[in-house]
UniProtKB/Swiss-Prot annotation:
Residues 12-34 are annotated as: Disordered. The keyword Phosphoprotein applies. PANTHER family: GENE, 27021-RELATED (PTHR37455), SIMILAR TO 1190005I06RIK PROTEIN (PTHR37455:SF1). This is Uncharacterized protein C16orf74 homolog.
Length: 111
């Protein structure tokens, strides 16, 4: 581990329900949760490790209470195994066992 990684803390296990004691404001927030299923009380003291642009690829700085501007990125899943994408939407292209692509109608030429 790098020295910067030693400064990172893991998010502690958090029960899905607050204790039976009278709920406080943080407990109410923890009970509601958010769309991601994370409870705010679980994130208390959480540190995030990210890479920086200082060209040091061995260490990641530890950031506390900082807002990161992250662009919206759409990641598309890979195509199903053995199927390639053709330029002609009416015709599918399949990948053979050797990893090369063939059109549906074209078989290997006979010798």
């Amino acid at each position: 581990m790098t020295p910067a990684a030693h400064g990172c803390k893991r998010v502690a296990w958090c029960p899905s329900r607050p204790p039976a004691s009278a709920p406080s404001a943080p407990q109410e927030a923890a009970r509601r949760g958010d769309a991601m299923g994370l409870k705010p009380s679980c994130l208390k003291g959480f540190k995030m490790c990210v890479s920086s642009s200082n060209n040091n690829h061995d260490e990641a700085p530890v950031l506390n209470d900082k807002h990161l501007s992250v662009p919206n990125i759409i990641i598309t899943p890979p195509t199903p195994t053995g199927m390639g994408l053709s330029r002609d939407s009416n015709k599918q292209v399949w990948m053979d066992e050797l990893g090369s692509y063939q059109d549906d109608g074209e078989l290997e030429p006979e010798a």
